Amino acid sequence: AWINHINSGTAFPKANVNKHFWKSDMMTQHGENFYMSAKIISKRTYGTESLNNENIKGYNLPLGATNIMTTGKEYDNIYPVWDWTRIPGTTAIGNQDKTSLEGYQIGNNEFGGGVSDGVNGIIAYKGKYNELQANKAYFFFDNMMFCIGSDISYVQNDNVLTSVEQNLLNGEVIYNDGQEKQLSSNSNMQLKQLKWVYHNNT
């Protein structure tokens, strides 16, 4: 269904389907014209790998990375300019040196896993990587994903960043900080009372 959707725009079945891939610590949710996923790590899995000088900045990929897609093209051509400290769904250290990966990343946390009834699901983990402690949980309901973090702590001076999404600009960016507004072109903004952002169908 996903290949047909990418190639010809064929709609997904209207029913939502949730799947927990327990051998790889991953959960997917898809329905008509959307796909979402979350990837975690545990002692049962290799989170990611860097071999043949590839994926050398992929350390954060298994630490709660999410994908949110409605067209399948959301991340096309982004990787040359991708900020590897801000992988969607992750809570990570804002230092490019902390993204470096060599060989296999083996999970060290006991608590990690998920549960699915085939329609909705939850996946979560509790871990400490690069001295950053975080509890992360991802709840999938219908066409929504709720990402929850707690007990986040880090003793060094680098910023700790929780990222919701990162893709190339495609159309208007609408946000609400008490009032609904449109982000102007070529702007860089920090908001303290942000309620929501809408861009690229999400």
Model regions and ranges:
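Extended polysaccharide-engagement surfaces of secreted carbohydrate-active enzymes
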Residues: 1-202
